[in-house]
């Protein structure tokens, strides 16, 4: 056995110590290996991820930081060009760990949204995702899962669910993606109205599947297994009859047979791109997933008959504008002979810069403008709802 192969074996042994939760032994072994083999490329590359995992396990900010700094340094070294995707991935995990060690859930939400470590993690994950298709399924699933965790920490829960779905497309039984998706779904369960029970049941079943998966500890360590088991217990407390949690949930697929050609396209297009406003996130191929029931609930003083109606007008207008923008988007993607003929009646100058002008492009541009206008109205609504001391701008409902 040559020296390089021996080092790989030692690195593998350190990784096993981490998976078993023996972090102090792992850091001692890594430091000893570094001392014996200074400036070794294999060690320099692998220690980035090892330091981050060990520091996270020991809750040692400085060890994690050391791993991140080492990784950032290697990214600037052209001799590690072939390893940059793995480096981006490890560094992103490091920034996530720095965030988790520095802040907790009780902190001000502004420190989450603008947190430098979270933003750095998001950027590094995205860099890794650009070229991830060249890697094996295991790495791709883990990358999408960790990116989902980052989005969830940023308060972008719906996008996090989409990231977990990407991981599960690669491996439908990937335990970390399955468990983390279930935990993200739990957040939405309590605000999903009539879907609350079904979402808790689905979350419980997914968590059990993840916690019983023999590969869970390999990918997430002992902490992930304990975390998932704790979530299962929390869900069980919500149900007097625990047998309900084993119920087989059925979601009959929506019926397209009675629809016109465009309506069918519209439903499938909006469903594919998740454009409907509902919390039926545990199943997207049934009738409940292709409607827009989302609204708000609020408590007003007895005798106050105006506040809720005034707020409702804001929401109605925002939802109406959204529905129109969505319709325009779908129309821009649906080729029709009558629109083709109408488009031909308007002459456009060829500006020689590859710009496109026609009815379909116009519909797409209008959808974009309408959507952007909605953002202004949402900001105005938030200002009114929370009675923020911000000057009004010319936004009309």
Regions inferred by a protein language model and the residue ranges of each:
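Single-residue signature of alpha-solenoid repeat helices
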Residues: 26, 64-67, 121, 160, ...
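Flexible helix-coil transition and linker loops at the boundaries of alpha-helical arrays
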Residues: 30-44, 71-87, 125-140, 169, ...
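Amphipathic alpha-helical repeat scaffolds of TPR domains
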Residues: 2-16, 38-58, 80-109, 137-153, ...
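Charged, amphipathic alpha-helical oligomerization/scaffolding segments
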Residues: 120, 202, 209, 313, ...
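Elongated, non-catalytic scaffold/linker segments and compositionally distinctive motifs
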Residues: 126-297
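Charged alpha-helical initiation segments
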Residues: 2-6, 16-18, 240-364
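Short non-catalytic regulatory patches outside canonical folded cores
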Residues: 345-397
